[in-house]
Amino acid sequence: MPELPEVETVKRGLAPTMEGALLVRAELRRPDLRFPFPENFANAVAGRRIIALSRRAKYLMIELEGGDVIIAHLGMSGSFRIEKGPIEAGADPATPGAFHHPRGKDEKHDHVVFHLDGGSGPARVIYNDPRRFGFMDLARRSALADHVFLRGLGEEPTGNALDAAYLATRFAGKIQPLKAALLDQRTIAGLGNIYVCEALWRSGLSPKRSAGTLVDKRGRPKQALIALTERIRAVIADAIAAGGSSLKDHIQADGSLGYFQHSFSVYDREGEACRTPGCHGTVARIVQAGRSTFYCPHCQK
């Protein structure tokens, strides 16, 4: 599933084509994705100019003039691609947000087509989703904080609001395993399995450790929590700079792959040597709450 860096990469890839363009028509090729489209969705967005693209957690936000926002989630296999100019057979489109190594975009899975008119001429932004776990919704910008998909989300790992003092308030007294606490979207919005594993390895912290052990008796963050916060922010920044992780379906807006997977230190490296200097441990895989966790039992305590 696309995580925050992948969705950020998709947003940045789509923005040059979509921002400022007129959304001439929304072509829905089926009545639903994971959920039904909102009633009158196509008519509601047609003829509106796209003001900006933004992101909240793992959600792509397409902001329209007039105060409406299209909320899009890529699910497990969703991707966008851009086709520019007149429709021509055999055109080679750019792919702004898939997710594995190059995979053919079977047109039978093209479920939504946004027909645009921008400064460089007509374009089509096509949403392709073989498994149909993605979805789209339409909401008023003024009501986003209370939207069912967005309310209760925690701080973004890319902003200054995520600091050790904030995490201390969330972790104090918790016996919950550290990995589970970090995956709680009410604490950190958009942080997923891959990057939690990597941040914990960089911090030398076991995913099985109780979250509350990183907070002192006065509720203040211990040095380990301060370091963990810095590592979380760093691993997300590194992944965004690399264009995400090409694990299952993620491809950048220009069709190239994300390359952060080449920087994985523990994720998906079960049985391989730990990359911590001086550590002679081996990366292990365990299952926590139904999710694979990769870590080094030797150096992560």
Curated annotation (Swiss-Prot):
Pfam families: Fapy_DNA_glyco, H2TH, zf-FPG_IleRS. Monomer. Binds 1 zinc ion per subunit. DNA binds at H109, R131, K174. The keyword Signal does not apply. A zinc finger (FPG-type) spans 265-301. InterPro entries: DNA_glyclase/AP_lyase_DNA-bd, DNA_glyclase_Znf_dom_DNA_BS, Formamido-pyr_DNA_Glyclase, FPG_cat, MutM-like_N-ter, Ribosomal_uS13-like_H2TH, Znf_DNA_glyclase/AP_lyase, Znf_FPG/IleRS. Keywords: DNA damage, DNA repair, DNA-binding, Glycosidase, Hydrolase, Lyase, Metal-binding, Multifunctional enzyme, Zinc, Zinc-finger. This is Formamidopyrimidine-DNA glycosylase. It comes from Rhizobium meliloti (strain 1021). Involved in base excision repair of DNA damaged by oxidation or by mutagenic agents. Acts as a DNA glycosylase that recognizes and removes damaged bases. Has a preference for oxidized purines, such as 7,8-dihydro-8-oxoguanine (8-oxoG). Has AP (apurinic/apyrimidinic) lyase activity and introduces nicks in the DNA strand. Cleaves the DNA backbone by beta-delta elimination to generate a single-strand break at the site of the removed base with both 3'- and 5'-phosphates. It catalyses: Hydrolysis of DNA containing ring-opened 7-methylguanine residues, releasing 2,6-diamino-4-hydroxy-5-(N-methyl)formamidopyrimidine; 2'-deoxyribonucleotide-(2'-deoxyribose 5'-phosphate)-2'-deoxyribonucleotide-DNA = a 3'-end 2'-deoxyribonucleotide-(2,3-dehydro-2,3-deoxyribose 5'-phosphate)-DNA + a 5'-end 5'-phospho-2'-deoxyribonucleoside-DNA + H(+).
